[in-house]
Amino acid sequence: MQKIGVFVCWCGSNIAGTVDVAQVVEAVRQIPDVAYAIDYKYMCSEQGQELIRKAVADYKLDRLVVCSCSPRMHEATFRKCAEGVGINPYMVEIANIREQCSWVLKDKAEATAKAIKLAKAAIAKVRFNGALKPGESQVVKRALVIGGGIAGIQTALDIAEAGYKVDIVEKEPTIGGRMAQLDKTFPTLDCSACILTPKMVDAANHENITLYTYSEVESVSGFVGNFDVTIRKKARSVKADMCSGCGICTEKCPSRKTPSEFDMGLKNRGAIYISFAQAIPKVPVIDREACIKFKTGKCGICSKVCPAGAIDYTQTDELITEKYGAIVLATGFETMPLDKFGEYGYGASKDVITSLELERLTNAAGPTEGHLVCPSTGKEPKKVIIVSCVGSRDVSGRGKSYCSKICCMYNAKHAMYI
């Protein structure tokens, strides 16, 4: 039979001011396997820990539940106390009745009822705990960064400069992410490309960094320090090791009806394309859904004009498995789907655009070479209205209830250079 000891802390008035600790003690005493239960003002104090040690000796306790503050505060304290009296430290469970109970509830009856439930849950958990021993395992000294935007690039550079190998996996054909689409940064209105492109080059040329562009993480298994990751390297239909990035294939492609993802659909691109002039790697990719060759078996112009013979229509996806000690998620953001917000006219009027579409219109390398025009007419607008917080702080359920924290800043930026 297990012998569980339950120790309920007052935490001064932090807990006892809202929770009836005596009632909690009385409730847990009725639970099978609870051999001892008591409350005390400060269970983490030396006097409180001595109370625990004495109870273990007197009642031959083999498992402990401490109802107190967050385990982030004192889990190590109580584990060390248990270990000192011969109880495996992993036979200790913390019921957080402060941050998760007394600090978030005002009604004493409600807080006490919740504290009892939390205590019961911890008791149920500790019944199934097993004695564990700390072990050691070799950590793979290689990191994976998922996302090749500015955050992912800078993270990879920092890790690489510290002397570790690091791989970047980016789903788009090039690194750069959203920052590559921007014209200027806030609040200094510095050139976005002037900041980003040197870092892109540094990442591509760093001896400790490997780029997996046009690739996605297929699966992750393992544990901290030892992850097994499968990466799907999608077929570009272009041999990267042979391509010089001359761009002849993209110029000659006759299929030019696909909206450019990089330019937010404000102009079209070819079926074979390079996202933007500073792309890294500067290797085109064939969009098989738009390519005449893949749809009909005809055309093949890009293969005919390629001076390096780099076009490969038979190329297939490649699965690569690597081991990593750490994984960083730097996956970036997407704009809020505006089909949920019909009152603004997005989709109904070509002249209602998103912030990223505005970025492309005002970018010197964008579809209008930096000239702000109305998409419907191609003429310069007389007035511009900026609607803030669309989809943010939304209580209707269509967007997010919280503030995006960035839209006010980029709205101010747009207003400044418009």
What would you call each of these model-derived segments?
Residues 43-45, 213-225, 288-290, 317-318:
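A conserved short coil-to-beta-strand element within the FAD-binding core of flavoproteins
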Residues 1-17:
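A short, flexible N-terminal coil/short beta segment enriched in small residues
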Residues 47, 57-59, 102-176, 234-321, ...:
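Rossmann-like dinucleotide/flavin-binding elements
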Residues 21-35, 43, 51-54, 80-97, ...:
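N-terminal glycine-rich dinucleotide-binding loop that anchors FAD/FMN and/or NAD(P) in oxidoreductases
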Residues 61-69:
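Periplasmic-binding protein-like
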